[in-house]
Amino acid sequence: MPDRLAVLAQYALPKRALTTWAGKWASARLGGLTTALIRRFVARYDVNMAEAANPDMAGYASFNDFFTRALQPGARPLARADLICPVDGAISQFGRIGKDRIFQAKGHAYSTTALLGGDAAMAARFDDGHFATLYLSPRDYHRVHMPCAGELTRMVHVPGELFSVNPATACVVPGLFARNERVVCVFESAPGPGGPFALVLIGAAIVGSMATVWHGQVNPPRPGTLRQWDYAKGQVRLQQGQEMGRFLLGSTVVLLLPRGPLQFNPQWAPARPIMLGQAMAQRCAD
């Protein structure tokens, strides 16, 4: 009950104003104060700085630099698998996509069309496909990498709410991931014929911005209207394991995969911790 009340209280909070303030504060260069706050954050969330490319907490000019810290080379070896985990975090849910329906939590599902910003034709390409919802906590590495090689075809910034995306909120707020602000990145598998796949970066309260490697910072600005960018064939190609984007602080990634035989890692289960590069799934022969 306390968790539910805390989640319901989010409806009354000025989430957008708080997030704007947090974004400005996180980008500020405050010298020793920034270092002191980073040290406090690392202690509170038990962040493993030993694996960071720069383990010196005094070496980050702003909180944003710390949140988006790189890892040391070799810190996340890539498994030999058709699909690898694109992030560090925990499994929220995974499984089959129904006809325009994705499972969120017990008693809750949401529309694929709504998740993708209202594009029913694109959503239909994922009917009877597969999804994985992956939660990044504040302590996790905040960059997002490619689960397989792909060629970018479209990016959409969808305006929306800024609820928290932690597991407690996912169990209470209907259609959470299709309500929050998000950046939809649609790819074609390269080389084919794997079909389309989408990485959807879900915004959240206090997540100041999201960025991609080909565009840079996507938000802010937050104009309140849907924005779409289309990409020519061959314009943006990324290899498996290559960075594609990043969050400031932490949030959720929803991965959509097309119809076809697929076997998720048998060790996968909701709430299980995952790490970038681990085996996620194998495509199966028809």
From Swiss-Prot:
Cofactor: pyruvate
Superkingdom, taxonomy of origin: Bacteria
Residues annotated as site: Cleavage (non-hydrolytic): G250, S251
Main subcellular location of this protein, as a coarse class: membrane
Catalysed transformations (reactions): a 1,2-diacyl-sn-glycero-3-phospho-L-serine + H(+) = a 1,2-diacyl-sn-glycero-3-phosphoethanolamine + CO2
Gene Ontology BP, a term: phosphatidylethanolamine biosynthetic process
Topology within the bilayer: Peripheral membrane protein
Assembly, per entry: Heterodimer of a large membrane-associated beta subunit and a small pyruvoyl-containing alpha subunit.
Family listed: Belongs to the phosphatidylserine decarboxylase family. PSD-B subfamily. Prokaryotic type I sub-subfamily.
Name this polypeptide is given: Phosphatidylserine decarboxylase proenzyme
Organism this protein belongs to: Verminephrobacter eiseniae (strain EF01-2)
Source lineage: Bacteria, Pseudomonadati, Pseudomonadota, Betaproteobacteria, Burkholderiales
Gene: psd
